[in-house]
Amino acid sequence: VYSKYSSYNRYITLGRDTVKKILQKDSFDDGVYRIEKNHHRTVNDAMAFGSYGISHSSSTLNAAPIQFLRKLGFSYGGHYTKYKGSTYVSDAILGIKYVMEKGDAEDDIIPTNKHYDDLLLTNRDEKDIWAVYENPNALPIAFMADSSVLDVVLEKDNPFANQNNLLSHLVSDEYTEYFKQISVSKTLPENAKQSSYGAHIKYTPIVEGENSHIEFIIKAPTEDMIYMYLPSNYERKVNLWLNKDFLDYYFEGGNMVIQTLGKFEENEEISLIVTITEDKKEVLFKDKLFYYLDEDKFKEAVSTLREHPLNISDFSEDHIKGTITADKDGVMFTTISWEPGWTVKVDGQKAEPV
């Protein structure tokens, strides 16, 4: 698979120009933040655009950040991570301040974002229109946090529990349930036989060649954002349908991620259909996880963590200098991944990271 240079050049030119316009609008005087997007030519686009993101591929295989992002519900592979699977919480913790969306310029419709309404700017060429949305809850690249965050262990199969655990212990030594689970009121298989396969639930078509799917019915407890995740050790491509409309593919191709279902009226009934594809002939998952985010509690946590940021006075690719004030015992938390070669100094004295 290859693309013409003209296509590459147009995409990169528009991307670089959009990032340039973001930086003209926001000088980031209050800190260092990340810029991401929900469309990808490659996972290394940010490097080509001159911005900072979480999408990245490297043959050096820094496994720790890949697994960290995977456990938060993002797209991942052996050597890469991709900005797909975001939530309000993960965007805040990772300091993702702006998110870019892409649409067709011929339609002349500004593309929307599932999470954010604050439109910073649009940019276009003859084929595409890009829209940039601002995340009002983005945290700085480093800030003071509770020491109990050092004891946080992220599990493999529930990114909502992981985000609850991480955000809770950034704020204090007490656990807070920001994401709350929604029970499935009905499970409706259509031409699908259920069986057990180790720790997994397995569905296969009863009659091959005919439509085979599993429908999950839930009710929205509040008008807050609702998310979904299906953990599995056996990734077989399926199609997802939200209220009968196509939502996305799932599992294969880096698609075992948190899916944003949206906001609904309180007590509104929501249908999610998982369609088994004819070539795979099965689907296996350990659990069906539906959660909503208590947005009021989440915003309170963000407000607390913003009280003691690292005030950066000098920043480059390999050097960061700043001051931070701690009004109690704690740790300075940063989402810059640790690599051999970094040196940390506190008040001029070398310190070991924890």
Task: Show the residue positions of the predicted features.
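Extracytoplasmic/lumenal acceptor-recognition loop(s) of multi-pass membrane glycoenzymes
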Residues: 2-7, 23-94, 139, 301-304, ...
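A cross-kingdom signal targeting lumenal/periplasmic-facing segments of multi-pass membrane
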Residues: 51, 58-208, 215-217, 233
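Beta-sheet entry/capping signal
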Residues: 32-35, 97-98, 129-132, 227, ...
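Membrane-proximal, lumen/periplasm-facing interface regions of secretory-pathway glyco-
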Residues: 2-21, 288, 297-306
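Short conserved micro-motifs at the rims of enzyme active sites and ligand-binding pockets
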Residues: 47, 143-146, 334-335
